[in-house]
Curated annotation (Swiss-Prot):
Protein name: NAD(P)H-quinone oxidoreductase subunit 1
Organism, as annotated: Prochlorococcus marinus (strain MIT 9515)
Function: NDH-1 shuttles electrons from an unknown electron donor, via FMN and iron-sulfur (Fe-S) centers, to quinones in the respiratory and/or the photosynthetic chain. The immediate electron acceptor for the enzyme in this species is believed to be plastoquinone. Couples the redox reaction to proton translocation, and thus conserves the redox energy in a proton gradient.
Gene: ndhA
InterPro entries hit by this protein: NADH_UbQ_OxRdtase_su1/FPO (IPR001694), NADH_UbQ_OxRdtase_su1_CS (IPR018086)
Keyword entries, A-Z: Membrane, NAD, NADP, Plastoquinone, Quinone, Thylakoid, Translocase, Transmembrane, Transmembrane helix
Catalyses which reaction(s): a plastoquinone + NADH + (n+1) H(+)(in) = a plastoquinol + NAD(+) + n H(+)(out); a plastoquinone + NADPH + (n+1) H(+)(in) = a plastoquinol + NADP(+) + n H(+)(out)
Length: 372
């Protein structure tokens, strides 16, 4: 297994060069991964919120935000500051402990999942070797927070929203996991680094989307349902449930739901990029680029190009999927709850299971194409 660059070891070696002991260097390192993840996630949310506002405005033939900074780029910051200073209200008959714990359980697992996302060649905070398994385990915690929030609010609309969120998540978690298992089966690894490296042979032709088109579609549909994006926003349908499980929330507790939703959307887009679109891989193999430039593959220029373009490609692929998700919000009608559950249990689940069995058969029959 390619472990990639050990960021902790490199950081400790740099601090040792300044005369610090390994124990002190380790203590300084401990909060840094989460700090890096938090900063990356918050910046990603700010960009996504601005994109959603501008794309939504364009879809409705409006201008969108334009006064808060150039082209309204400061509007997401203004939204965050507004929520920060709003009063934090707990309903009179609500369970205050569960009411407060719910938003935390929604946000924390999503942020922790970012630890296993490689943003570029050898650029990964924690390559635990079972990154995909860890992400599936963490994603199963979020519905508990949603159900807890709906139950603790002492509001019928909130409770219905929480129940819908739990039912929706359970229905789509299984086909989501089965579609990922097909990719894991071809790679023989649960590491996100190994999954991307397995797609790096022939540029765009090596990407898993060609070998797993059905899995790609199932994963994207399930990811949208897990993120509660239209047409799957049943838990917070404004016309039916006011705001669903968020109805009684205000201030920073509401902001945690808001933040968690967008962080989950970006995370899902990044995982689609890693699992099916080659991650940091450039559509043209680096060997061809080096040959055109008449440079050896290990030349410093090629190494710098590979590292730089890797981060750019990962982010570009992810935001292309975010763009598609935003467009779907304004171009598709909301499904009913019975239609949503039927889609998950009667269609996606058997298709994803059949796709996994087909992948196993093709792996035995054509090991050179499906990971022998």
């Amino acid at each position: 297994m390619n472990t990639g660059l050990d960021l902790e070891y490199s950081f400790n070696e740099i601090l040792k060069g300044f005369g610090l002991s390994s124990e002190i260097a380790h203590i300084i390192w401990l909060p840094l991964p989460m700090l890096i993840v938090l900063v990356s996630a918050v910046v990603g949310v700010l960009v996504t919120v601005w994109l959603e506002r501008k794309i939504s405005a364009a879809a409705q033939q409006r201008i969108g935000p334009e006064y808060a900074g150039a082209l309204g780029v400061l509007q997401p910051i203004a939204d965050g500051l507004k929520l920060l200073v709003k009063e934090d209200i707990i309903p009179a008959k609500a369970d205050s402990i569960l009411f407060t714990t719910g938003p935390i359980l929604v946000l924390v697992p999503v942020i922790l999942s970012w630890l296993i996302v490689p943003f570029g060649q050898n650029l990964l905070i924690s390559n635990v070797g079972i990154g995909i398994f860890l992400w599936i385990a963490l994603s199963s915690i979020q519905p508990i927070g949603l159900l807890m929030s709906g139950y603790a609010s002492n509001n019928k609309y909130s409770l219905l929203g929480g129940l819908r969120a739990a039912a929706q998540s359970i229905s789509y978690e299984i086909p989501l996991a089965l579609s990922v298992l097909a990719v894991v089966l071809m790679t023989n690894s649960l590491s996100t680094i190994d999954i991307v490296n397995q797609q790096s042979g022939a540029g765009i032709l090596s990407w898993n989307i060609w070998r797993q088109p059905v899995g790609f579609i199932i994963f994207w549909i399930c990811a949208l349902a897990e993120c509660e994006r239209l047409p799957f926003d049943l838990p917070e349908a404004e016309e039916e449930l006011v705001a669903g499980y968020q109805t009684e929330y205000a201030g920073m507790k509401f902001a945690l739901f808001y933040l968690g939703s967008y962080i989950n959307l970006i995370l899902s887009a990044l995982l689609v990029s890693i699992l099916y679109l080659g991650g940091w891989g450039f559509p043209i193999p680096v060997e061809i680029i080096a040959k055109v430039l008449n440079l050896p593959i290990n030349a410093p220029v090629i190494q710098v190009f590979t590292a730089s373009i890797g981060i750019i490609m990962t982010v570009l692929k992810a935001y292309l999927l975010v763009f598609i998700a935003i467009l779907l919000r304004w171009t598709t009608p909301r499904v009913r709850i019975d239609q949503l559950l039927d889609l998950g249990w009667k269609f996606l689940l058997p298709i994803s299971l059949a796709n996994l069995l087909l992948t196993a058969g093709l792996k035995l029959a054509l090991p050179q194409f499906f990971g022998g």
